[in-house]
């Protein structure tokens, strides 16, 4: 379960940001997790419950925004969200190899005090 190490790193970044802004407590973390990131949101939530203990995020809420895969067709230049793992453009029926969104794992925002 690599989500534990990912959450440890994410929480370390959040704590560093909180300290840089003079905060003593993290109330909320918002993550953007791409559908194709290889990260399981429920495992990330479980990892957060474990790694936040005895930190300034001990009482924090974790919000996860799941980001769908968005492709861009090289043929007709339209963006689309594929319906399966074959990225066929619904506009021109060609296969796309360009994923524009949906692979990320980002710390999108923090609520601090």
UniProtKB/Swiss-Prot annotation:
MF GO annotations: nickel cation binding; zinc ion binding
Residue pairs linked by disulfide bridges in the UniProt entry: none
UniProt-listed Pfam families: HypA
Binding site for Zn(2+): 73, 76, 89, 92
Lineage: superkingdom: Bacteria
Traits of the deletion mutant: Disruption of the gene abolishes hydrogenase activity but does not affect urease activity. The hydrogenase activity of the mutant can be increased by the addition of nickel.
Record's keyword terms, sorted: Metal-binding, Nickel, Zinc
Gene3D superfamilies: 3.30.2320.80
GO terms, biological process: protein maturation; protein modification process
PANTHER family associated with the record: HYDROGENASE MATURATION FACTOR HYPA
Xref: HAMAP family: HypA_HybF (MF_00213)
Family (UniProt): Belongs to the HypA/HybF family.
Name the record gives this protein: Hydrogenase maturation factor HypA
Organism of this sequence: Synechocystis sp. (strain ATCC 27184 / PCC 6803 / Kazusa)
Native organism taxonomy: Bacteria, Bacillati, Cyanobacteriota, Cyanophyceae, Synechococcales
């Amino acid at each position: 379960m690599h989500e534990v190490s990912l959450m440890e790193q994410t929480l370390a970044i959040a704590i560093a940001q909180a300290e840089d802004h003079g905060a003593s407590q993290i109330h909320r973390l918002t993550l953007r997790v791409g559908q194709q990131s290889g990260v399981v949101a429920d495992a990330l939530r479980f990892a957060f419950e474990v790694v936040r203990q005895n930190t300034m995020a001990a009482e924090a809420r974790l919000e996860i925004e799941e980001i769908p895969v968005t492709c861009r067709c090289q043929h007709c230049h339209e963006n689309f969200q594929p319906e399966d793992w074959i990225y066929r453009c619904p506009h021109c029926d060609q296969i796309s190899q360009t994923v524009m969104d949906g692979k990320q794992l980002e710390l999108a925002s923090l609520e601090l005090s």
